[in-house]
């Protein structure tokens, strides 16, 4: 009997076992329903039933905005990977390596240059999956370089913010990115180019205290958590109970902190319309989203290099 239970049965189970992908199903944080991952991915990571907006990676975000899902990656400057030789439970350099392997990104922000309904734009996207989208030297350089390119190309700059705040492993060098990015935003304003911010879930800490709240137009995704300090910290400090929905996108819109709350499916036409209005450009023919990209990899362009618009069929 032991031979049957200990040897034969496990072998049969192994023969019949099928490998199941870990992310085959997604549980909605709002309703608790299980949804097929492919359905959520096809729906721009919005849960079909509850309309809950899941976090969206940088590459997926750029694909959803640029014409024909095609753009040029903006080459970003290298920075010292671990200036403070920081270590907690794990070395900082090892954390960066793990984050790069997991996300296939160099750091928390990816910058692209391309066309949005025929008009040239520069877009920066923070990816929360890369160390919580934290603002460090590399992320600060990415924002500054993107703004410089927007000035050079005389095009709008759009940033999708998603961050837990400044990167503690870089100390004061991380906090220094707050004034640096603020100065760069002012440089774009002096060039009379639009600066549009899309606040996604979550946008907190030093990012909220710098470039994420300086937009000519402030847009938020539904249900996004937006604030500087956490609600619990605020309650403990002021010794008062905060109102329901405090720091959520809808609450901030009601109190004038953001201009509009836009569903993810409506973001692309909304951003295109705002860019046309703010640049006083005529309405252009909308590029078809059903057309497949004619180049597979995004090409590289530096901020000082003149790049053509993303190629189309």
UniProtKB/Swiss-Prot annotation:
Keywords: ATP-binding, Cytoplasm, Fatty acid biosynthesis, Fatty acid metabolism, Lipid biosynthesis, Lipid metabolism, Nucleotide-binding, Transferase. Its EC number is 2.1.3.15. Its main location: cytoplasm. Gene3D superfamilies: 2-enoyl-CoA Hydratase, Chain A, domain 1 (3.90.226.10). It is an enzyme of class 2 (transferase). It catalyses: N(6)-carboxybiotinyl-L-lysyl-[protein] + acetyl-CoA = N(6)-biotinyl-L-lysyl-[protein] + malonyl-CoA. GO terms for biological process: fatty acid biosynthetic process; malonyl-CoA biosynthetic process; negative regulation of translation. Residues 24-293 form the CoA carboxyltransferase N-terminal domain. Pathway: Lipid metabolism; malonyl-CoA biosynthesis; malonyl-CoA from acetyl-CoA: step 1/1. PANTHER family: ACETYL-COENZYME A CARBOXYLASE CARBOXYL TRANSFERASE SUBUNIT BETA, CHLOROPLASTIC. Belongs to the AccD/PCCB family. Component of the acetyl coenzyme A carboxylase (ACC) complex. Biotin carboxylase (BC) catalyzes the carboxylation of biotin on its carrier protein (BCCP) and then the CO(2) group is transferred by the transcarboxylase to acetyl-CoA to form malonyl-CoA. Acetyl-CoA carboxylase is a heterohexamer composed of biotin carboxyl carrier protein (AccB), biotin carboxylase (AccC) and two subunits each of ACCase subunit alpha (AccA) and ACCase subunit beta (AccD). This is Acetyl-coenzyme A carboxylase carboxyl transferase subunit beta. It comes from Bradyrhizobium diazoefficiens (strain JCM 10833 / BCRC 13528 / IAM 13628 / NBRC 14792 / USDA 110). The gene is accD.
């Amino acid at each position: 009997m032991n031979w049957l239970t200990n040897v034969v049965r496990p072998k049969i189970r192994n023969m019949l076992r099928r490998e199941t992908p870990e992310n085959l199903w997604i549980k909605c944080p709002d309703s608790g329903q299980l949804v097929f991952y492919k359905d959520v991915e096809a729906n721009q990571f919005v849960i079909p039933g509850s309309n809950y907006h899941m976090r969206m990676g940088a590459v997926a975000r750029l694909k959803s905005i640029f014409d024909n899902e095609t753009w040029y990656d903006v080459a970003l400057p290298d920075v010292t990977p671990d200036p403070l030789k920081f270590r907690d439970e794990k070395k900082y350099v090892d954390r960066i390596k793990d984050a790069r392997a997991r996300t296939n990104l160099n750091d928390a922000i990816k910058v692209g240059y391309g066309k949005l309904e025929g008009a040239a734009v520069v877009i920066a996207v923070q990816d929360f999956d890369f160390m919580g989208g934290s603002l460090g030297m590399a992320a600060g350089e990415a924002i500054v370089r993107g703004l410089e390119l927007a000035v050079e190309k005389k095009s709008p700059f759009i940033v999708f913010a998603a961050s837990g705040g400044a990167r503690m492993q870089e100390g004061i060098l991380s906090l220094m990115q707050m004034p640096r990015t603020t100065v760069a935003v002012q440089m774009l304003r002096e060039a009379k180019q639009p600066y549009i911010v899309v606040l996604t879930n979550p946008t907190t800490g030093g990012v909220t205290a710098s470039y994420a709240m300086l937009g000519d137009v402030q847009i938020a995704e539904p249900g996004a958590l937006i604030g500087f300090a956490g609600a619990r910290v605020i309650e403990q400090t002021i010794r008062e109970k905060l109102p329901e929905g405090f720091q959520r996108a809808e609450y901030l819109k009601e109190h004038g902190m953001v201009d509009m709350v836009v569903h993810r499916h409506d973001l692309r036409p909304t951003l295109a319309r705002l860019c046309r209005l703010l640049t006083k450009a005529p309405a252009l023919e909308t590029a078809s989203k059903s057309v497949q990209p004619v180049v597979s990899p995004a090409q590289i362009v530096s901020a000082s290099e003149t790049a053509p618009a993303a190629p189309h069929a």
